[in-house]
Regions:
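A short, N-terminal "cap"/entry segment at the start of jelly-roll beta-barrel domains
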Residues: 1-62, 155-167
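Double-stranded beta-helix
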Residues: 1, 10, 124-167
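A structural connector/turn signal
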Residues: 66, 76, 85, 106, ...
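Short, conserved beta-strand element in jelly-roll/cupin
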Residues: 63, 68-73, 81-101, 140-143
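Short, solvent-exposed loop/turn segments that connect beta-strands within catalytic domains
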Residues: 57, 102-106, 133
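Short acidic-glycine-tyrosine-enriched beta hairpin
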Residues: 101-121
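Short beta-strand His + acidic residue motifs that chelate non-heme Fe in jelly-roll/DSBH
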Residues: 77-80, 97-99, 119, 125-131
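Conserved short histidine dyad/triad with adjacent acidic residue
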Residues: 47-54, 65-82, 121
């Protein structure tokens, strides 16, 4: 195993992540540069859908990444897809998640604390904070190093990896 030669102290140092030590990344995604899509990602395990797989502060992912998103009222993200399942699990506040088809038909799902949605691979989805308070929620994806999200909007899709140039 990869930890065979490590002491318990070394394992604890590398495989424990604390909220206070995770820096919020306000440029984790290309669409986060746009008003209405601003949000911060705190990476605990891996990089999630940000594509920032070189983040040495996060615990190395094996089977899945885990991050915490912070979203102010009125903000969210652009409709997008992944090649793997994505889960939003609300910790604090309220979040409106959505799924939509290729024609733009959308279903909104209001989630509160301790509620979640699992978005299947290839299904267009996203979220917005329509409440008056910030929301914190956990995000997990179904592969250790998923590809950068694919945006439904062609104008966002083309530069979807530009944010990685400054990473």
């Amino acid at each position: 195993p990869e930890v065979a030669d490590l002491s318990l102290e070394q394992i604890a140092e590398r495989y424990v992540s604390r909220f206070r030590d995770c820096t919020p990344d306000w440029e984790a995604f290309e669409d986060a540069k746009i008003d209405g899509y601003r949000r911060a990602q705190r990476r605990f395990i891996g990089a999630g859908g940000s594509g920032k797989h070189g983040d040495t502060d996060a615990i190395p992912p094996r089977g899945f990444p885990l991050s915490i998103m912070y979203v102010d009222p009125g903000e969210g993200n652009a409709p997008h897809t992944h090649e793997v399942e994505e889960i939003f699990f609300v910790l604090q506040g309220h979040l409106t998640a959505f799924i939509q088809d290729e024609d733009g038909k959308q279903i909104d799902i209001r989630l509160g604390p301790w509620e979640c949605i699992a978005c299947p691979p290839g299904v267009i989805h996203g979220y917005i904070n329509e409440s008056l308070d910030p929301v914190y929620f956990q995000v997990m994806l179904g592969r250790a190093k998923p590809e950068t999200m694919g945006y439904a909007d062609d104008e966002l899709y083309a530069p979807r990896g530009d944010h990685l140039q400054s990473a």
